């Protein structure tokens, strides 16, 4: 079985030359009818063909890299190599060597990679002036001394200060690997990377086992194993004083039974003072029990959709909270600083497959209140957290659209093909806008057109938006008239533009 294996540096400095080698095993590189090439994939992008060599000796390069790239074959060692000069940050990518069938070049970016039949595993190459550095690893644990019996204990490894990316994290209980969650890497301002990984385990299981997280950083050839975690609740049980429960997550006053042994002499007084000092430290640092949630709560406020403002003459606000335990969470509303007397709809607590929970509350007001600039506030209340408030306020400097156009992008040629219409609207603020299509005054299903999120206009505080409608070939000689309808929260009327594909006219209207 033919196998390909890339080798080379994982880190290259800007302006230097990247040298990679692909070792071929399981078959001769001289075999006729094949092409040997290099392909790369930058982060977040598609595959990009670099170049390759045909068995006849002909070499082909990507035109965008010509002048920087050299590919050569060493048949005596059964390998082929890549040299890429003048490296820059744009050359950071996963590099693959591959074997393909004729033709000897492929536009991988368009998906025509059917000719590739053998791939290497790939090697990550980073272009940076920062030196290679192994990560620092720190153990973290849930910060509670009295976990609930039915609550999980969350262990975490903070992995930081390494370069280049990336690291591999594996969790073990004893010798058994454990399912874990590793978060996406973040590049710090100093160009070094950081990430974290966490493991959630039942309290009883944590008391019985030994846990470790293993971090491997290929570029620095380092491997770090973190074994030691803070002392378990089982070991602390004998020294824990009786706690008087208070609000969950707040500091509690801890008390112990009075000593029954009479202290005599100076030695007894010193022991008594030491014991009082220990009790004081316990009172200052101990919480009665872990809050039932293990992840921070996130609260979000959605402002009214333009559809509701126009079609229902209502302003609907949705406030929702996400976390791992929301049974004690409560959402409240204020309108202009006062509690509303109606219009509030409470959603049910929802549990999701990833272990998280969500809950929402919806407030509906007359559109006139929102247009008048009335403030709307949603507050998340939870026993273990300070209140979290989010306020929605209509932009005072709103501006209605000033220009609407409807153009034919492509006509049906041949006649049985589809046509495309482009509707553009500009000069409005804020960016919330409703754009819909009508076919002979009937609303077109949203699956038939593609709207775009309004970007800001260059050099202006206003926005513009567009939508493309696919018009299928007419089933009869009588074509339909298509209308683009636009509404904005600051518009007094609906704007519309129409076009008939047969007579090719455009009319721009004000109110419908």
From Swiss-Prot:
Region (Disordered): 225-296
Disulfide bridge map: 22-97, 157-213, 319-378, 423-484
Residues bearing glycans: 238, 255-256, 260-261, 354, 445, 496
Region (Variable (V) domain, involved in antigen recognition): 1-129
GO CC annotations on file: extracellular space; immunoglobulin complex; plasma membrane
Polar residues compositional bias, start-end: 235-247
Composition-biased stretches (Basic and acidic residues): 267-287
Alphabetic keyword roster: Adaptive immunity, Cell membrane, Disulfide bond, Glycoprotein, Immunity, Immunoglobulin, Immunoglobulin domain, Membrane, Secreted
Matches recorded under InterPro entries: Ig-like_dom, Ig-like_dom_sf, Ig-like_fold, Ig/MHC_CS, Ig_C1-set, Ig_sub, Ig_V-set, IgD_del_linker
Major location category of this protein: secreted
Region annotation (Constant (C) domain) ranges: 130-512
Residue intervals of the Ig-like domain: 1-97, 135-227, 304-392, 396-502
Pfam families: C1-set, ig, IgD_del_linker, V-set
CDD domains recorded: IgC1_CH1_IgD, IgC1_CH2_IgD, IgC1_CH3_IgD, IgV_H
Compartments it resides in: Secreted; Cell membrane
GO biological process, one term: adaptive immune response
Complex formation: Immunoglobulins are composed of two identical heavy chains and two identical light chains; disulfide-linked. An IgD molecule contains thus a delta heavy chain combined with either a kappa or a lambda light chains. Kappa light chains are found predominantly on the membrane IgD (mIgD) form and lambda on the secreted IgD (sIgD) form, this fact is poorly understood. Membrane-bound IgD molecules are non-covalently associated with a heterodimer of CD79A and CD79B.
Function statement: Immunoglobulins, also known as antibodies, are membrane-bound or secreted glycoproteins produced by B lymphocytes. In the recognition phase of humoral immunity, the membrane-bound immunoglobulins serve as receptors which, upon binding of a specific antigen, trigger the clonal expansion and differentiation of B lymphocytes into immunoglobulins-secreting plasma cells. Secreted immunoglobulins mediate the effector phase of humoral immunity, which results in the elimination of bound antigens.
Protein name: Immunoglobulin delta heavy chain
Organism the protein comes from: Homo sapiens
Lineage: Eukaryota, Metazoa, Chordata, Craniata, Vertebrata
């Amino acid at each position: 079985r033919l196998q390909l294996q890339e080798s080379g540096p994982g880190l290259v400095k800007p302006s230097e030359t990247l040298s990679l080698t692909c070792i071929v095993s399981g078959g001769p590189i001289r075999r006729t009818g094949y092409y040997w090439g290099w392909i790369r994939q930058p982060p977040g992008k598609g595959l990009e063909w670099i170049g390759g060599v045909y068995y006849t000796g002909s070499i082909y390069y990507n035109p965008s890299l010509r002048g920087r790239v050299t590919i050569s074959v060493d048949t005596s060692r059964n390998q082929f190599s890549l040299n890429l000069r003048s490296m820059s940050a744009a050359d950071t990518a996963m590099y693959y060597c591959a074997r393909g069938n004729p033709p000897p070049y492929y536009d991988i970016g368009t998906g025509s990679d059917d000719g590739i039949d053998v791939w290497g595993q790939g090697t990550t190459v980073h272009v940076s002036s920062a030196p290679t550095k192994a990560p620092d690893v720190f153990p973290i644990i849930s910060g509670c001394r009295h976990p609930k019996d039915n609550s999980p204990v969350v262990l975490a490894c903070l992995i930081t200060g390494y370069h280049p990316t990336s690291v591999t994290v594996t969790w073990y209980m004893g010798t058994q690997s454990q399912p874990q969650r590793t978060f996406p890497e973040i590049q710090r301002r100093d160009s070094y990377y950081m990430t974290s990984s966490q493991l959630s385990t039942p309290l009883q299981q944590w008391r019985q086992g030994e846990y470790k997280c293993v971090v491997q950083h290929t570029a620095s050839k380092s491997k770090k194993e973190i074994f030691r975690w803070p002392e378990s609740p089982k070991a602390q049980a004998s020294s824990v004083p009786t706690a008087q429960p208070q609000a969950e997550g707040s500091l509690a006053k801890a008390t112990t039974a009075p000593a029954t042994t009479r202290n005599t002499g100076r030695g007894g007084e010193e022991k008594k003072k030491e014991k009082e000092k220990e009790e004081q430290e316990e009172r200052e640092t101990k919480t009665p029990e872990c809050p039932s949630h293990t992840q921070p709560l996130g609260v979000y406020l959605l402002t009214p959709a333009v559809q509701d403002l126009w079609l229902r003459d209502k302003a609907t606000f949705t406030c929702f909270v996400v976390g791992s335990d929301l049974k004690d969470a409560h959402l409240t509303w204020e309108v202009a600083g006062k509690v509303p007397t109606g219009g509030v709809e409470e959603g049910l607590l929802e549990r999701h497959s990833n272990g998280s929970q969500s809950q929402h509350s919806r407030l509906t007001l007359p559109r006139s209140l929102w247009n008048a600039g009335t403030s709307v506030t949603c507050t998340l209340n939870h026993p273990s957290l300070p209140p979290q408030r989010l306020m929605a306020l209509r932009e005072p400097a709103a501006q209605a659209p000033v220009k609407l156009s409807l153009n034919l992008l492509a006509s049906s040629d041949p006649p049985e093909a589809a046509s495309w219409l482009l509707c553009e609207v500009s000069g409005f603020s804020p960016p919330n806008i409703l754009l819909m299509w009508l076919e002979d005054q009937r609303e077109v299903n949203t699956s038939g057109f593609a709207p775009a999120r309004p970007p800001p206009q260059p050099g202006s505080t206003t926005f513009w938006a567009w939508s493309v409608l696919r018009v299928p070939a007419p089933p009869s000689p009588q074509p339909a008239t298509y209308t683009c309808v636009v509404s904005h929260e600051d518009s007094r009327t609906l704007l519309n533009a129409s076009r008939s594909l047969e007579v090719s006219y455009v009319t721009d209207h004000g109110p419908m």
